[in-house]
Structure formats: C-alpha cells, structure tokens
Amino acid sequence: MKLPIYLDYSATTPVDPRVAQKMCECLTMEGNFGNPASRSHVFGWKAEEAVENARRQVAELVNADPREIVWTSGATESDNLAIKGVAHFYASKGKHIITSKIEHKAVLDTTRQLEREGFEVTYLEPGEDGLITPAMVAAALREDTILVSVMHVNNEIGTVNDIAAIGELTRSRGVLYHVDAAQSTGKVAIDLERMKVDLMSFSAHKTYGPKGIGALYVRRKPRVRLEAQMHGGGHERGMRSGTLATHQIVGMGEAFRIAREEMAAESRRIAGLSHRFHEQVSTLEEVYLNGSATARVPHNLNLSFNYVEGESLIMSLRDLAVSSGSACTSASLEPSYVLRALGRNDELAHSSIRFTFGRFTTEEEVDYAARKVCEAVGKLRELSPLWDMYKDGVDLSKIEWQAH
C-alpha cells in the first residue's frame, strides 16, 4: 500500500491507463494528430473519424443519438452553454428559471449572472435528505418559466435526484429541463431515450478521463435551441466554436466506453468498500451521514463528526486525501452551503468530511483510512472542552454563549 491514500474521487479521478494509451496515440507525427476540421487530406479525415467514434461512445453510455452530443471544455462550460444558451434564445417566452440551492457553483454562478441580466431565478430548498422532489419543482413552476436545472448526483453529499420524474413534469408543462450529470456518469444508469431530459452536462475527469474536456447533450426531438456562447469557426453545428482537441475527445470516449462496460461490477465493489469504511468509523459516537441513506451513490460518504473541527481533522489525516466541501471552493472557511441548505447547524457543517471512493481504491486502503479517522477523531475530542461537556450530559444546544 502506498501513502498518501487518495479518497477524493469526486474532486477528480486519475486517468485510466487504457484512456491514457488511447490519448497518446493522437499526439505525435506517428499518431492521429490532424485537425478534425481539415477536409482536404487524410490527416484531417482520420482525426474526424476518431472524434465521431468518441462521440458515439459518449452517446452510448447515456443512450442518446451521437448527433445530440456537443463537445465542450468540461461540465462548467456545458452548464454555462445550456443555461445561458436557453435563457438567451427563449427570453421572449419568459424570464423565469428554477434551480436548487445545492447545485454546483457552475450552475449557481451562471444563474446569478442571468439575474444581473434581468432574469428571475427561484432557488429550491432541498429536504433534510438533500433531495429535490418533483413536487418542489411543481410548486415553483410559473407561466413564464422557461428552464429547470436540477442536478443528478450531488458532488458534495452523493445524493441522487429522481431526474426521470422531474423530466416527466417539466415536459408536461412545456418547460426545458437541464441536468448537471458530471458526478453520475459511470455511477448511475442514464437512458436519455426514455428520460424526458432536454440538456445534460458531462465531464471526462470525473469518469477516469482527462481534464479539460466535457460534453453537452442537446435533445433533437423535440428540438432544443441554444444561443452559442463562443464564436469563431462554427464548429459543433455552430453551438461551440474552437478546434476540437482530438486527444482529449478520444480520451473521453474511451473513458465512457469503459464506464459502460464496467459500471455494474465497479459499483458493487465500491458499495462494499464504502459500507466497510462506514461500519468502522460508525464505532465512534456522534457520527452523522449527510444526505439520504438510500437515494445516494455508494462512491460518496459525507460524514459529520460532532465536536471536531473539519479543518483540524483534515490536518490530522496527513496520509489521506479527503476534502471538506467541493474542491472548487474548499479554500473558503464558510461552512458548506450544501450542508447549510440541508438544515445542518454550523457546528455539524464545519465538522463534515467527504470521503469518495473509486476504481483504484483497495480494501487495505479503506481499513487503514478508517483506523486513522478513528484515531484522529479520538485525539481531537480529548482536546475539546465541548466534548467533555457533552460526555457530562450537558445539553449544548440550550447554552447561551456570550458574544465577544
């Protein structure tokens, strides 16, 4: 076993060696390095063939038509293109958008920008289980609603929303539905032939592919129109200009091919590891699982260790790569906005750690990590006067602390 141990697979995944091999074949003079837009010679034709093969591989994982897959630089760009693209194209129909308070910042910052442009946005509060239900969406729908954006799998707590049911609702009301699925590819089965989802964002680097490449699914029937956010050359049917990065696209295609073939077995294995880890750390008192215990992916365990400061715990776990909150914003000392939206108090939100398991996690690593967590929590609680008071039977919620 090598240290440190990587347990932050929701932040990013290492590139699968099979993916890296395919990518290397598209970089040098001996390989498939051509510009896919070069129509006049074989180098361009071969590159275009590789790009279209990858487009088919991505489409197959989610049961879509390859023509519905648009290449982007990642899920952040896909979210921007979907939300701004719809808002700008359909603004004459209405200026109301619905999303949730626990979306990724790529969605929330995009809707904030649209608010500055005169759009109105409703931010749904999740239940204590971290889920957004169709009933919540239905209650927020208005005559002028043009778009609903509710994610599939939450990046911080791993909860899984029922996007099929939300899609049935939005389609029946003539409202477009966008889903951020960055965290669900390779973890949860997606069937876009059946689901009434209009737009879906994908990322390669959350699915053992390279960083810097993603895709947006844009439904053809019924047709969804977007206003391009990037201009210059008219690539990707005018929706996203820019020379296509053949090596990254081929990498994403291969990553999604592997995900399709190995998802079922991999999820079972990871569920076993996650359960093993959770059982061991649950021997500690005052450990809380954040988000639904059932509607979640097994890859993600977000736990709060009461009477322990999350940052101190991370510092104590020097051999473990884990996170508190989302990697994009984990430098902030504010408690996680996702956990606050669940109704967790500041103390529990501050004491949360996200453990995420993946393809290369082993049983030995999980056992070592659980042992280290139990040791660190025990030591930190020994230093905590609040822990002493709790052990003495003091109800800390009833104490009025003096402000200073």
Swiss-Prot record:
Keyword line: 2Fe-2S, Cytoplasm, Iron, Iron-sulfur, Metal-binding, Pyridoxal phosphate, Transferase
InterPro entries per the UniProt record, alphabetical: Aminotrans_V_dom, Aminotrans_V_PyrdxlP_BS, Cys_deSase_IscS, Cysteine_dSase, PyrdxlP-dep_Trfase, PyrdxlP-dep_Trfase_major, PyrdxlP-dep_Trfase_small
Assigned GO CC terms: L-cysteine desulfurase complex
N6-(pyridoxal phosphate)lysine: residues carrying this PTM: K206
Main subcellular location of this protein, as a coarse class: cytoplasm
Location(s), subcellular: Cytoplasm
Reactions it catalyzes: (sulfur carrier)-H + L-cysteine = (sulfur carrier)-SH + L-alanine
Function: Master enzyme that delivers sulfur to a number of partners involved in Fe-S cluster assembly, tRNA modification or cofactor biosynthesis. Catalyzes the removal of elemental sulfur atoms from cysteine to produce alanine. Functions as a sulfur delivery protein for Fe-S cluster synthesis onto IscU, an Fe-S scaffold assembly protein, as well as other S acceptor proteins.
Species for this entry: Azotobacter vinelandii (strain DJ / ATCC BAA-1303)
Gene3D superfamilies: Aspartate Aminotransferase, domain 1, Type I PLP-dependent aspartate aminotransferase-like (Major domain)
Residues that hold [2Fe-2S] cluster according to the record: C328
Protein name in the entry: Cysteine desulfurase IscS
Subunit field text: Homodimer. Forms a heterotetramer with IscU, interacts with other sulfur acceptors.
Family in the record: Belongs to the class-V pyridoxal-phosphate-dependent aminotransferase family. NifS/IscS subfamily.
GO molecular function: 2 iron, 2 sulfur cluster binding; cysteine desulfurase activity; metal ion binding; pyridoxal phosphate binding
Annotated binding of pyridoxal 5'-phosphate, by residue: A75, T76, N155, Q183, S203, A204, H205, T243
EC number: 2.8.1.7
Cofactor: pyridoxal 5'-phosphate
Protein's pathway: Cofactor biosynthesis; iron-sulfur cluster biosynthesis
